[in-house]
Every structure is written in C-alpha cells, then in structure tokens.
Amino acid sequence: MQMFRHSSADMWRAKKPTLERRSTDGRRSSIVDWINGLSDNNNYKSDHWVEKHDEGCERMTRNGSVCAVEESEPDVPTQHREVLLTKLKIEIKNIMAEHGAKKYLNLNSPYVTSLCIAVDACIMDGLRRRLLTLFNSPSSMSLLQIIAKSNGPAQQVLDQTREIEELRTSAIPVHLIWIREALYLKSLSTIINHFIDSKSVRRYYDNSALLLDPVKGRLVATLMMAPCMVTYRRMSNRIEQEATAEELVEGATRGSTSTVPSRPPLSITRQVSSIAASVERNGSVSRDYVFSLHHSCKSTLLYGKNNVCVAMNGSDFAKGYMSLQKFYDGNLSLKWVPNQLMHASSQPSSGHSNNGEFTNIWKNTINIEMQDIIYIHLHQKDEISPTCLTFVNCEGVQSAPFQLPAGQHSIAFLSSLETGLAPLLRLDPPLWVGTTKEKILPRLRKRSTAVANPAMLDYVFRLVRTSGVEPAPEDIEDPLAPTSHSPPIHDNCVSLPNSPYIVDNVDSIVNFQIGTACQSMRNQIMARAFYGWLTYVRHLRTIRTHLLHLVDTKTLICDDDCDPVDEKFWKQARAEPTEENEKEFLKRVYWRGIEGINTKEVRRMAWPYLLGLFEWNESPESRLEQFTSQYWQDIEEWRVLEAEVRRRDEEAFRAARARKAASPVREESCDVFEDPNEPTCSQHYDRENLITLFRANLHRIDKDVERCDRNLMFFSNKDNLESLRRVMYTYVRRNLEEGYTQGMCDLLAPLLVTFEDEALTLECFSLLMLRQRGKFPQRPGMSKCLLNLRSLIQVVDPQIYALISDIDYAQALSFAFRWFLLDFKRELSYECTYKVWEVIWAAQRLRITDDFAIFFGLATITNYHDVLITNNFDYTDMIKFFNEMAERHDCSRLLSSARTHVKCLQNLVQHLK
C-alpha cells in the first residue's frame, strides 16, 4: 500500500493531454438500451477518436474517470439540429419502452402522435417553404407528393393518407397522418432515406438543413428503423383508447350500472420536454373519453337530445346531453352526461382549476342498460308542460327523473326506444299511430269517477318480450276498438263459478311449483353455507401453514386513540427515559407517526432510537463523536484506493486507444492490468483483489448517484451528491464482500436528507441494510415476502387472488418486487416514505410484526380492488397501473388499512392458538 500513499487523493483530477472516444456502444443488449445511450449523449458526433488538449474542461469517461476535453461553442443551426435529434430520441425511447411491455401499440396513441410531431420537425428543418407554394400548403406532405411518382412505398402511404383524409376519420393534421401511416406500413425509414438521396427533394432544403447533414441526416433515417419494427393496430373506437391510472380510479369511484368489459393494456404517462404537449395530451384523453360515451363505431345512435334536465340533489336540476344507442348485440343503452363535463372536456386539462368539483361532476354521469329496465313512468301535467321520464329496473330501483322539454320530445324518444327494442322487446302498451301516420301516446280510458278538471297524464310502459302476448291494462283503450264509448259495466254483474276440478288441478300445479322453488332455494342456501365453510377452512389452513409467523399475538395493541409524537412529547419522554415512555413513544409512532412544527428535527432525533442505534436510556453525544472519527478514517483509507482506480482507468483508456491505432494482426488480451512479470505472492494477490472489487463497486455507485432523485431540491446541489457518494463508498469499503447492489442509493437518500450528517447517516443505513439485505437478489428474503403476500391476498381478497392465479406463478406478484426491495420508496413521495418507514420500524420494535411492509403492500393492492377486478387486469396492466400510481397513493388510508389487516390476523392467530 506504500506505493499508493505517495500519490495524492486528488492526483486523478489533474488535467493531462488525453484522448476520449465520444461514441455510443453499438453492442447494446437491446434497442431500448441503444436508444438510451444515444439520448444520454446529446453532443453525439461521428464514431471517431477526438484529440483533447490541456485547454479543455474535465469530463467523466464511461468508467467514471475524469479526462480533459476541449469544448467549442456550436453555432445556432447546429444547436437547433441537436435539439431536434434529442427530442426525436426521447420519443423513440418512449415508443420502444411501451413496445417492450406490450404486444402492439395503438396507432392513435399519444406516444405515436408525439413521435410524428418530432419526425415532422426534423423533416421541416431548413426547408425552403417559399419554393413549395405550388402545393396546397408547404409541409412534409408536399415532399411526399414529390417522391410518390418514383417511390413505391411513398405512393402507397400517399394513397392511404388520402383515403383517411376523405373519410375524415382522424382529427390530427394531414402532415402527421402520412407519418403515422408510414409507421403503420413500416416504410418511414425508407421514405426518409429517399428524401436524403433524391435530388428533386434536396433542392428544396438549405445547406444547413438537418437531412442534408452527412451524419445526422442518415441518423434520423437509422433511428426510425426501430419504431418501424413495432406492431401497430388501428383502434377507431374511442372507448378503447387507453386511460390513465387516475381516470381508472375515478371511474371505479363513480360506479356504473353496466358491466365494463376487459380493457386494453394501459399506457405509461411520461413527461415530455414540452409542458403544453403534456397538457394537450391529457386533455385529449379526457375529451375523447367523454365523446366516446355517446359516439362509438360499435353502436348506432338512435336518439340524442341536449339540455335534458335530471334531478340531482332533491329539487336541483342539472342540464346535460342524453343519447340512446343500440349496440351490435341488440342491447340498448341510455347515457346522460352533464353539460359542464361536455364543455370542460373540450378545453385543455389545465383549465380545470378545481379538481374536486370536476370529480363530483364525473359522479353525476348516468348509464342505464335498457335490458335491465322493466317499467318506464311518464308524467306530464299538460301538453305545454315538460315531461318527466323515470326508469325502474328489475330490482325496483328507480333512476333519477329525466325532464324533457314540452312538445313532442317525449314521443320522439319513446318512438326511437320502441324501434330499438324491436324485434326482441316491445312497449306495453304500444304507441299509437295517429291520423298523420305519426306516433302518439295511447289514449287513456275515461272513468265514470273522472272530474271535469284536467288531470295529469300518467303512463306506465312495460318492456315485455314479443314471444308472450299479455292482456292490455284496463285503463288503456284498444286502438282497434270503435271510438264510441261502451256503456259502463255495473257492479251487480254475476259470473258462474269455476269447475272444482279445474281449481283443484291448478292448486296442485301451483303447490308443486312452489315446493320445487322452495327445495331449490333450500339447496342453494345449503350449498352456499357449505362452500362458505369450506372457504373458511381453507383460509384457516393457509394461515396455519404460511401466515402464523407473520404476527406476534403476545403484543396486542388495540388502543389507537393516541396523539402523534411531537416536540413536546419528545422532550417529556427524553427528560425521563423510562421503559414506559419508550413503549408510549413506539405506540404513538405506530398509530399516529411523527408530526409537529419542525417534523424534520424531531425525526432527526427520534430515528436513531427507532432503528436501534441508541438505547433508550443512552445519550447520543459521545457516540456521535466516535462515529464521526471512524467515518473520516475510513474515508482516508478508501481515497487511496480510489486514486489508484482512477489512474488505472486512464491507463486503460490510453491502452485502448493505442490498440485501435496500432491495429495488430493477431488478437491479444485486452486486460491491461495483467503483467506476466508481476509477483504472485499472496499479499500482492490480496491487494489486487481489493482494488478490483472496489473498482467494480465504485463504477456502479457513480452511475446510480448521478441519477438518484435529481428532481429533489436537496440533490440538485452537487455537494449533497458528493455526500451521498462518500457515504456509499464508505459503506461498501466496510462491506466489500457484499458489495453494492442497485437500489441501495434509494434507501440511503431519505436518511441523508433527514440527518444531513454523513457519519450518522452511515450508521443508520448500516442498521437498515441488516434488515433489507436479505431481500436483495441472490437472497431468499424476497421470495418469502412475495409468497406471504400471495397467501394474505388469498385470505383477504379471493377475487384478486383468482385474478392473479390466472397469471404465471413466477410473474403473478413480480410488480411488488420493487415495493419490498426499497420499502416503497419509489412508490411514495418523500414525506409519505418517512411515515411508512417509521411505522415499519415501530412495528418491529414493538414486536407486532417484522414484516409490516407486506401488510402495507396488501393494503395497496386491495385498495384498488374495484379497478383491478372491473378492468380484468393482466400482468402487464398491473405493472403499468401501479407504475402510474407512483407518488399518488393515499398514504394515510393505506397505513390505516395495513394496521387493520395486522390486527385481524392477530385475532385469527390468537383464535387458532
């Protein structure tokens, strides 16, 4: 180690003439990784070696070393081309990420539209638009028309685009439609290459155009080869367009009378470079969903009327749009959407200032399936008054009354309804045909008790099948009977009695049918009771086999009526560090968490005790000094190793450049560290092994630290990133055999943000890793967590268990892998992460359960029961849904549900014992 100490720790930072290869690795494992490499290198140049000098600035190489490079300020056109290429790479990356989780992509997807916009911007760069005035509009579509005569794929795309434009089936501009169709026909890369090679097209471009660039122009065509490999599908029905996770959750809370069929896979909402594009995309999804409620290619619109009033709260009426649709299977659906929602959906989503009010409007939408309706009540005071329609389903539940304007609107609706019901159903009584061959309401039969004053016109229509002919009600006249009124029937009319034989025969048949129905009901009740008992026994067996060890029944804390830990309680508890105060502290953290005026300061003092770093009756001052001293000693030790690693990285860089320049005839070993003349003593071997292990971990840490929570204000400061790097280096140096695994930085970051003390953060992180290390790859802890979660779902929510049972066992709950690996750090915001971690630590210290994270995962899944079951999610849908819901969960609700699950399991286990 003496040879290392002669060099300063900052030796590797010295600026020396060196070489850097600025190119991407063409041997990436997948297209997505290749595109990632392209997007990371925004200053991409040709694949060649560039000489660097002392005047340049420092830049980290692929292995983390710092080399001196020379930077020249590009001109404005060059910068613009770089921006266009960067946006194009981002959109291609999003497309390929979507394709990696799906078998196909919707051609109307916002991701495809965003890619078309980026491609159109690249094609239009440097275009002399004044030379294209012979065409209708100077756009990329004009260039397609120019090459269509000499290029077969371009002509095919042009014909397809014209057909779509004539049918007007798309709302996007025509200069984007042809790009989308070229993607669908997998010929976009070929067409762009023809743009570059065609002399008739090149004359329309300036010399500084992107497509005329000898390198970047071809790069655009090459990049488009990846999206052309994706399988696209046309989905003209707007209801099949993908909804976001928030819309699915809102739809589940609204509730609907109709059964929602299986939904296509979800899309990932990603952030793009333009905020306006994101707003337009979200508004488009909401607008299309509202329009799809009334217009669909799978249904026929029979009737539509605006400004139809519906009683919402008591006597309050809201106006909206009502439509009657008939689907291809013969079913009819009546839908009503408030005007506020129709108007709001036509505006960008940023226009919704009050999300709560907008959500309440969504809850007022009505969807009635006519096959469930048996009665329709019509009430009208007189001919100049509005008409009220009320629908009653087979369970006797009435819908909100629909108020149609005065006039013939109610008759028009009933006529459309009667037409749509045929031939399977009909209205009873049917509508009459008047003298003008128009439908009219049936005439009520006049009664002798009628008064001279006009009464309300009340009708009750039944929906009956056409196969059975039933007698008309007594108060409705026969439309075929003569108009003259028959004499009234007197009450003293007498009829002959029925035959006793017939009466007895009918009674026996009725009794037999009733007995059969009762026996069937008895069998159903017995079967239901038996299967309920069988399910209960199976659940108890699952608890005995898999879940008995999850909770401790000796510690039953049922008193949840307590206050959170704040500054006042913390001072009182630390003033008298008794065992009772410690239990009270842990109980408060478990039930109510840590709150207060300065919550961060309270957490900074309380977390070391929660993690078990300090004993409750111990003062932390003396230990903190010891931690700090040991921490900086470890830093001095690994700085020597770091300097040697950086030096070897630079040597490897120069050696690789020399090998490429020399171009040897025969292949030699590429390991520049091997030296056959080196001694092979055990001491030297240990030193080399130490450097090799530390070098491998150092490079992995550097990559993860650079991308760790950069959206957080705390880590936008480079000094804090260096603190994170130092703490991670020190931990790995202390635990070099275990090494660094991706995800450790995610666990370390919240601790560093809270403590802002590197030595204390390292000690707490070491204790946290003692519990989390078993869940990392190559350890059995994660498999146990997923198995226990599966067993809990089987007991708590059999419907979700049946849903995941249809999925491959190895993949069923793999979306929860990241949950348990990082204790939900990436699923929650930082503040929610603090709350969940505190409860997990408190539950472990109270010996309630060592696996509270499993119960929190159970609460996360069961909280979205309606969304998962209603949409019949598969494995891919679940991954996308929970990825979209990241940092949007109701943390307090999930914690409360998790505590309830723990308490219920404790009671069951105690009952079994």
Swiss-Prot record:
<dbReference type="GO" id="GO:1990502">
    <property type="term" value="P:dense core granule maturation"/>
</dbReference>
<dbReference type="GO" id="GO:0005797">
    <property type="term" value="C:Golgi medial cisterna"/>
</dbReference>
<keyword id="KW-0333">Golgi apparatus</keyword>
<keyword id="KW-0343">GTPase activation</keyword>
<dbReference type="GO" id="GO:0031267">
    <property type="term" value="F:small GTPase binding"/>
</dbReference>
<dbReference type="InterPro" id="IPR037213">
    <property type="entry name" value="Run_dom_sf"/>
</dbReference>
<comment type="similarity">
    <text>Belongs to the RUTBC family.</text>
</comment>
<dbReference type="InterPro" id="IPR000195">
    <property type="entry name" value="Rab-GAP-TBC_dom"/>
</dbReference>
<dbReference type="Pfam" id="PF00566">
    <property type="entry name" value="RabGAP-TBC"/>
</dbReference>
<dbReference type="InterPro" id="IPR037745">
    <property type="entry name" value="SGSM1/2"/>
</dbReference>
<feature type="domain" description="Rab-GAP TBC">
    <location>
        <begin position="597"/>
        <end position="844"/>
    </location>
</feature>
<dbReference type="Pfam" id="PF12068">
    <property type="entry name" value="PH_RBD"/>
</dbReference>
<dbReference type="InterPro" id="IPR021935">
    <property type="entry name" value="SGSM1/2_RBD"/>
</dbReference>
<dbReference type="GO" id="GO:0005829">
    <property type="term" value="C:cytosol"/>
</dbReference>
<feature type="domain" description="RUN">
    <location>
        <begin position="106"/>
        <end position="240"/>
    </location>
</feature>
<comment type="function">
    <text>Interacts with numerous Rab family members, functioning as Rab effector for some, and as GTPase activator for others. GTPase activator for rab-2. In association with ric-19 activates rab-2 during dense core vesicle maturation in cholinergic motoneurons.</text>
</comment>
<dbReference type="GO" id="GO:0000138">
    <property type="term" value="C:Golgi trans cisterna"/>
</dbReference>
<dbReference type="GO" id="GO:0030659">
    <property type="term" value="C:cytoplasmic vesicle membrane"/>
</dbReference>
<keyword id="KW-0968">Cytoplasmic vesicle</keyword>
<dbReference type="InterPro" id="IPR035969">
    <property type="entry name" value="Rab-GAP_TBC_sf"/>
</dbReference>
<comment type="subunit">
    <text>Interacts with rab-19. Interacts with ric-19; the interaction is direct and may be required for the activation of rab-2 and dense vesicle maturation in cholinergic motoneurons. Interacts (via RUN domain) with rund-1. Does not interact with unc-108 (GTP-bound form).</text>
</comment>
<dbReference type="GO" id="GO:0005769">
    <property type="term" value="C:early endosome"/>
</dbReference>
<dbReference type="Pfam" id="PF02759">
    <property type="entry name" value="RUN"/>
</dbReference>
<dbReference type="GO" id="GO:0005096">
    <property type="term" value="F:GTPase activator activity"/>
</dbReference>
<keyword id="KW-0967">Endosome</keyword>
<feature type="region of interest" description="Disordered">
    <location>
        <begin position="1"/>
        <end position="24"/>
    </location>
</feature>
<dbReference type="InterPro" id="IPR004012">
    <property type="entry name" value="Run_dom"/>
</dbReference>
<protein>
    <recommendedName>
        <fullName>Rab GTPase-activating protein tbc-8</fullName>
    </recommendedName>
</protein>
<keyword id="KW-0472">Membrane</keyword>
